[in-house]
Amino acid sequence: MKTGLTVLIAGGGIGGLTLGVALRRAGIAFKIFERAPALLRVGAGISMQSNAMLAFRTLGVDTAVAAAGQEIQGGAILNPRGEEISSMPVSKASAEVGAPMITIHRGRLQDVLHQIVGDDNLVLGAKVEGFRDGPDGLFVRLADGREFQGDLLVGADGLRSAVRAQLLKEPSPRYSGYTSWRGVCDVSEGVRRDYTSESWGPGMRFGVVPIGEGQTYWFATATAPEGGVDHPDARTELLQRFSGWHAPIPQLIENTPSSAIMRTDIHDRVPIRQWVQGRAVLLGDAAHPMTPNMGQGGCQAVEDAVVLARCLSLEAELPAALARYQAVRVERANDFVAGSYRIGQIGQWENAFACWVREKLMRMMSSDRVDARTRRNLQFTPL
């Protein structure tokens, strides 16, 4: 179905750019509309787990992604004193599925994908506001009034997707009950280069993730009402919140300017099973926004992109291609939405006794074996 097909993509994030790479490899014409005026190295870190790296391998970009990031060999969940509660056999899992886990700055990953997509296929400063799909064709409308015609619209425009809003009449995103802070700093002392950790305390968590080039990405969560606002000095507030927690947590916060600390309330949406309507389809966070607790949000967007491009290449008719994409992807992606939500609720327990029980159970369940579910999560087959 390559001949004459033009795909319009709303959103130039990881999912939209990966779809652009996949379509370019497949010889399918496309145009990406990104609301930002430039693709800058903004944001924080992201985990490309083995399943995403296997998906990238089908596009021939896994080596470039790995070179721009940091390969991870292991990880653990700790308590606020720094004692290990549960270990994660990352290197064993990577060996079993045949691909590494790579952590990387979002901006560097974006650069790798952008270089392949090319500037000619990217329209910047272009916010998609809506579309019309009628007898005269499919037209995408931008906020500045411009219109573009194509054969398929892919909504890869995130949690608050304009494409999804037009397809579905539904409530606002679901608040998880906790907020987050994220930062990137150059501190490497006390941070293992190939090891990630997440420390769990009552109602709070703190993650430490090396992302290459001497940088460390960190994130923090705290149970809080939706819509809270930080004190102007976010760094001081976080140092107070995590006072007494083990190194290098205080050092990471201390070495990140308040202006570089991003606060975001954590949301997802109740999973849905219909991502397709006419000549419009959803991808990534627009289709299945999830909390970040399994590190799979970006990974699932990458999987979506590879599968959608493959379906468009293999099927003779557009409706059949979109139906196949939805059938392949919905259940797997929605499983991650549900699993991530459950982990977040457990991770944010505040009751002291409940946290004590949680720690005891996690110690008992910790294993250096790769269980069947983890193995399944980290595998990827395009179709």
Swiss-Prot record:
Keyword annotations from UniProtKB, A to Z: FAD, Flavoprotein, Monooxygenase, NAD, NADP, Oxidoreductase
Catalytic activity, as annotated: aurachin C + NADH + O2 + H(+) = 4-hydroxy-2-methyl-3-oxo-4-[(2E,6E)-farnesyl]-3,4-dihydroquinoline 1-oxide + NAD(+) + H2O; aurachin C + NADPH + O2 + H(+) = 4-hydroxy-2-methyl-3-oxo-4-[(2E,6E)-farnesyl]-3,4-dihydroquinoline 1-oxide + NADP(+) + H2O; aurachin C + NADH + O2 + H(+) = aurachin C epoxide + NAD(+) + H2O; aurachin C + NADPH + O2 + H(+) = aurachin C epoxide + NADP(+) + H2O
EC number: 1.14.13.222
Example GO molecular function: FAD binding
Keyword presence, Metal-binding: no
Binding site for FAD: 15, 47, 128, 285, 295-299
Enzyme kind, highest EC tier: oxidoreductase
Superkingdom of origin organism: Bacteria
Loss of function: phenotype: Mutant accumulates aurachin D and aurachin C and does not produce aurachin B and aurachin A.
Reported cofactor(s): FAD
Pfam families: FAD_binding_3
Keyword Signal part of the UniProt annotation: no
Listed InterPro entries: FAD-bd (IPR002938), FAD/NAD-bd_sf (IPR036188)
PANTHER family named in the record: PTHR46496, ZEAXANTHIN EPOXIDASE, CHLOROPLASTIC
Function: Catalyzes the initial step in the conversion of aurachin C to aurachin B. Catalyzes the epoxidation of the C(2)-C(3) double bond of aurachin C, which is followed by a semipinacol rearrangement, causing migration of the farnesyl group from C(3) to C(4). Accepts both NADH and NADPH, but has a preference for NADH.
Record-given protein name: Aurachin C monooxygenase/isomerase
UniProt organism field: Stigmatella aurantiaca
